[in-house]
Amino acid sequence: MIKKGLRVLLTALFCSLLWVIPVTAGPTGNHYTNGGEGIKAASVPGPGFYYRLYNFFYDTDDLKGVNGESVPANLDVFVYAQAHRLIWVTPIKILGGDWLMDVVVPVVYTDFEAGNGSTRVLDDHFALGDVFIEPLAISWHGDRWDAAIGLMAVAPVGEYDPNRPAMPGKGYWSGIFTAGGTFFPDKAKTWSISYLGRYEIHGNVRNRDVQLGDDYHFEWGIGKALPPEKGIGPLRAFEVGVVGYAQFQINDDSGDDVTWDKNVHDRVYAVGPEVRFVIPQWKTLVELRTNFEFEAKDRTEGIMGNLTITKAF
C-alpha cells in the first residue's frame, strides 16, 4: 500500500537554500531537492556576490511501497530542473560570522508516465517552480573547520494542479532551518568531511485540509583535493570524493482531507561519486555528482544527477 497521492507522483520542484535545491514527489512533502550539495556542503565563500546554477537530472521507474517493496505502477519519470540562485555574502558580522542572503528561482521540466491501458497517465510540462527566499544565514570559518546556519521560506508561486503530476508547484508554504559543518582533518585542508542538515515544515495545501508531515534531510561528502599541479588545460584545483543524502518524514500527515494512511512515513538514502574543479580565469567552480538512491519507502527510488556551476563576481 502507498499513499494515495503518490499515484500523482513526482511533482518536481527545485529549491535551494543554503547549499541546496529540490525535486519532490506527490505527497512526499519536502520542497528541498536532495543532491544539490556534496563535498564541502557546509562551506560558504567569503563576502561577495555569487551566481550559482544548479542542474538536476532525476530518472526513475521504481515506486516503493511502505515496506520498501517495488509497486507494479509501470512508472517512467524524468525530471530536469534548473535552479538559479543569487547569493550575497555581506561584510556584516552576526555572532562573529558572515551574514548572507539568497534567493532561488527554479524552472522544471517533468515527463511523467504511469499505469496501464485505459488507466495510464501521461503528462509533461515545463514551468516555474516554487521560489526559495533565505533572508538570514550565517557562515563561520576556523583554521580547520567551516560552519553555517540559515532560515528560509518557500513561496508557492509555481504552477500547481493536483490532477497533473508534471506541474512543479506544490501548493503550500514551507519553512526550512539549515545547519551544518565541514571539518578538515589535515592542516593543508586536502581532506574534507562535511554534513549539512535541514528540518522542513509545511503549511496547508491550497484549497484542501491537508498538512504534510515535517521532513528531516541531510547531505554529506568526503573529499580529497588533488595536487595543485594536477590540471587539464584551464581546469585546476581538482577534488574527488564520495557524497550522499538521506531523507526522513518525521511526523504524520494531518487534516480531514487526508485519504491515505497518516502513519506511513516516507524515506530514502543515496550515495555516489563527485568531482569538482575550478576555472581560475573565469572565477568559476564546477561540480558534477551522481547519487544512486536505495532503501526507499513510500516514494520513488532512482538516480539523481547534478551539475552545479558557481560564478564569483
Regions found by a protein language model. Name each.
Residues 60-62, 108-114, 124, 154-165, ...:
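Sequence/structural signature of outer-membrane beta-barrel proteins
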Residues 27-30, 58-81, 116-124, 165:
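Surface-exposed strand-loop-strand hairpins of Gram-negative outer-membrane beta-barrel proteins
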Residues 26-28, 40-48, 91-100, 140-147, ...:
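Short loop/turn motifs that connect adjacent beta-strands in outer-membrane beta-barrel proteins
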Residues 77-141:
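Long, hydrophobic/aromatic-enriched structural stretches that serve as scaffold segments
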